[in-house]
C-alpha cells in the first residue's frame, strides 16, 4: 500500500461510495453491497479488490463468503500528508504576506 494507491483508489466516486458503505456497515460482502447500489456484484467485487490493494479494506473469509471491513490507517496517513502539505502552503503564504507588506 502506498499513498498513490490510496489516492488512486479514492479517485473513483463509485469506489468512494463502496468504502463509505463498508465503513457504515462495519463489514459487508460484495453481494450485500451490490443490493444497496446501482451496480452489479461483480462490479462491487472489482472495486473492493482495488480498495483492498490500497489497504483501505481488509478481506476476511467467513465460510464461503468474503467479508470486507474498512481499515482506517491508510486514510489517516493520507490525511496527515495533506495536513502537512497544507501547513507548508500556509507557511509560504504567510512568508509572502510578510514580504509584500
Model-derived regions: residue spans:
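N-terminal helix-turn-helix DNA-binding core of bacterial DNA-binding proteins
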Residues: 2-40, 62-77
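Residues in the helix-turn-helix
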Residues: 14, 43, 50
